[in-house]
């Protein structure tokens, strides 16, 4: 018997016991996949129509070519589980724009558009959806590696973006109560405030493993065979996480935004003051929502944009006084970096960096739907502070701080270094006082300096002034800094910590400092 093909699911996990019907127009052969997901058989050379079915997955028809001579690379046939999923395309727009809602569900479902601001506020009911054909609400995924090209699902309904900008989610609930939610960033058609906030949409993509690849699992390409057991099959677990980012930049296949984001959901019953549950929500959109909710509650009007809006110029920085980036804005294009740098250092812009491990790695927008990550790790002890420095310019030259691995995976409060700085006005803090104790971050609890932290570096501008330091072990505390541009009046305030956003609603010190900086920068 020869290997004909492999069968795997949307995470590239091997599927055993899949019924496979091979039809060449003359004869029909019935085979089943092995525990490894491999399908073996004695098929004559030719082109076959293949029908696949297994309980818990949508049935599908594909094509397989069996060559006459010599070994051939076996096809990878992909099935989609019956868990509901969906996305809006494109995933960002401006007020009045149109989004295509694309949903996969094995049963009828209800869609609601919700704006996640000070609270979760229903914008409108999009309706109940079903189809006349049997299981016509079930989608399929392409065969092979579709992470660079997207899934190409059929549209269920078109939705017009509301006039009020912000972080929106479409919430899906099936007839039996299964749920899924997916983000839609709605920017204003024209500025409505002096404060712009950037959603970290490139990071959302980097962590999206739908299809079996992200920038953290099978980062360069899918392996030759589907995964049976991740910890024994994948180099990430066998030899360490650094394996994912050891190949040269040109080895990494692109990643498409046009896929569902199972790791980036917000629950329909979730409130911004709820603890943030789970590994990924603590640093993706759910954590960013906590900062947006706090800003609205405090009366700081703002306009939300996707990172693509900064890259392509939809976000005109010169129409704003303040730009806020938060939580985990790790992946920027050089166009994004250069635009913000020039705005701060030449035209007086005020940048608030309320996150950690930011602007660490360069990405290239291949088109409106696809990113290529220049993700090869910098050699320890090398001449560059990080990947962005290697491929473009130093992160600390823009933010005043840069991510280092010290303190990674820990969280702690901050200790005040310079209580006389205006960022601490009205707090009553003295040198050595501690703040940033309370946190909603359940993955890494412990304080506002945490998860991943940034510190000053040789490329930090000379004006970079230290205000507070995280109390993380082994010198891993985040450094809060303020710097001023040499000309033009531009300023940067950086906290250097992913967990800051998860603390602002529940920790008075974090809230007071954030409020002081926003008021001063926006005035």
Regions found by a protein language model. Name each.
Residues 104-133, 178-315:
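Aromatic-Pro/Gly-enriched surface loop or interdomain linker
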Residues 66-83:
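Extracellular beta-sheet/turn segments enriched in Thr/Pro/Gly and aliphatic residues
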Residues 51-63:
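A short, solvent-exposed loop/turn motif at the edges and junctions
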Residues 134-149, 154-159, 164, 277-365, ...:
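Helical hinge/lid and interdomain linker segments adjacent to catalytic or ligand-binding clefts
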Residues 39-49, 55:
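Short Pro-Gly-centered beta-turn/loop motif in secreted/extracellular proteins
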Residues 14-19, 24-43:
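Short, acidic Ser/Thr/Gly-rich low-complexity loop/linker segments typical of extracellular
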Residues 216, 220, 359-476:
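An acidic, glycine-rich "communication" segment
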Residues 4-16:
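Structural motif
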């Amino acid at each position: 018997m020869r290997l004909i093909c492999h069968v795997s699911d949307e995470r590239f996990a091997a599927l055993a016991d899949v019924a496979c019907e091979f039809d060449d127009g003359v004869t029909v052969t019935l085979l089943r996949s092995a525990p490894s997901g491999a399908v073996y058989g004695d098929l004559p050379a030719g082109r076959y129509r293949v029908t696949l079915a297994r309980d818990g997955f949508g049935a599908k028809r594909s094509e397989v070519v069996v060559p006459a001579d010599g070994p051939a690379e076996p096809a990878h046939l992909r099935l989609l589980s019956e868990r509901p999923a969906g996305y809006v395309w494109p995933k960002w727009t401006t007020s009045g724009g149109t989004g295509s809602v694309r949903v996969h569900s094995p049963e009828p479902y209800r869609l609601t558009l919700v704006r996640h601001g000070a609270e979760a506020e229903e914008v409108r009911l999009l309706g109940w959806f079903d189809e006349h054909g049997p299981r016509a609400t079930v989608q399929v995924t392409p065969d092979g590696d579709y992470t660079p090209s997207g899934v190409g699902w059929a549209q269920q309904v078109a939705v017009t973006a509301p006039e009020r900008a912000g972080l929106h989610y479409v919430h899906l609930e099936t007839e039996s109560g299964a749920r899924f939610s997916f983000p839609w960033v709605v920017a204003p058609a024209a500025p409505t405030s002096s404060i712009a906030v950037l959603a970290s949409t490139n990071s959302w993509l980097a962590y999206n493993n739908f299809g079996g690849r992200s920038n953290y699992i099978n980062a360069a390409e899918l392996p030759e065979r589907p995964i049976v057991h991740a910890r024994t099959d994948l180099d990430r677990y066998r030899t360490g996480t650094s394996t994912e980012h050891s190949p040269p930049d040109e080895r990494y296949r692109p990643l498409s935004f046009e896929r569902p984001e199972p790791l980036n959901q917000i629950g329909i019953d979730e409130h911004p003051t709820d603890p943030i549950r789970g590994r990924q929500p603590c640093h993706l959109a759910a954590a960013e929502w906590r900062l947006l909710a706090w800003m609205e509650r405090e009366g700081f009007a703002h306009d939300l944009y996707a990172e693509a809006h900064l890259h392509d110029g939809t976000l005109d920085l010169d129409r704003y006084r303040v730009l806020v980036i938060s939580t985990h804005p790790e992946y920027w294009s050089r166009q994004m970096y250069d635009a913000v740098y020039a705005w701060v250092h030449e035209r007086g812009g005020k940048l608030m960096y309320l996150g950690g491990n930011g602007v660490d790695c360069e990405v290239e927008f291949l088109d409106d739907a696809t990113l290529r990550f220049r993700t090869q790790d910098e050699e320890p002890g090398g001449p560059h502070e990080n990947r962005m420095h290697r491929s473009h310019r130093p992160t600390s030259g823009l933010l005043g701080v840069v991510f280092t691995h010290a303190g990674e995976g820990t969280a702690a409060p901050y200790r005040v270094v310079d209580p006389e700085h205006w960022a601490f006005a009205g707090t009553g803090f003295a040198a050595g006082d501690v703040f940033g104790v309370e946190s909603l971050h359940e993955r890494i609890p412990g304080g506002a300096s945490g998860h991943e932290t940034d510190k000053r570096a040789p490329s930090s501008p000379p004006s970079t002034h230290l205000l507070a330091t995280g109390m993380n072990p082994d010198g891993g505390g985040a450094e809060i800094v303020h710097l001023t541009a040499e000309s033009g009046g531009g300023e940067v305030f950086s906290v250097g910590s992913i967990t800051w956003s998860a603390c602002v609603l529940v920790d008075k010190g974090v809230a007071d400092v954030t409020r002081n900086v926003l008021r001063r920068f926006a005035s």
